[in-house]
Amino acid sequence: MIYNRNKKVTITTSYTRSIAQVSSRGEETSRQTKNTEKKQKAKTKSTNNTKKTENNISVNNVKISKNMDLTVRTGLSKEDFKKVMKNLSQDTSKFFYNNADTIYDLCAKYQINEIFFCGLISAESGWNIAGNHRKTHNYISLMSKGKLIHYSSTEQGLEVAAQKLHNNYLTPGGKFYGGKTLAGVKKKFCPSGTWVDLVYGRMSQVMKAVKKVQ
């Protein structure tokens, strides 16, 4: 009886040890799985961050020229673009800063260079947006029967401006397409001999704000 009892104890002890070993291996496997998952998440996060960096450029690399393609965006992130608008000293009414999100999103939607779009609005409406343009929400002097077309809101006015530029002036086959440069847009948008210099001058003022962003 004693032998059997001891044997039973031995068997039980051996069994308990086996259970403990299995449990230990299970915990180790669980830890390894969690570590693998953490590494995969970290790798995915790193990849996403790399993509964001690749898609956006430093403010130091933003450039403009008179013969630039106006359908090529600046490459700035929205955050940096808003900083640029905040640093735009000519924007005393804060129209450009307050509408920076809308302007940025519309330029993305309609493939328009942000600096050109701001420069054009300023050239046509003034940095502080003249009363007739502010009242009609018409920021690039779109006309009908010799009068500024009236839009219902700032958002609609900006959207129509971007849409018309894209469809009519900056897209091959568009109604008023003459090229993707300032000189090309000028042919039908405003034949005035000083228009290119006016718009580019306003764009240059925006560039001064770009250089202030750290």
Model-derived regions, located:
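Catalytic cores of secreted/periplasmic lytic hydrolases that degrade extracellular macromolecules
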Residues: M1-I115, S122, W127-Q214
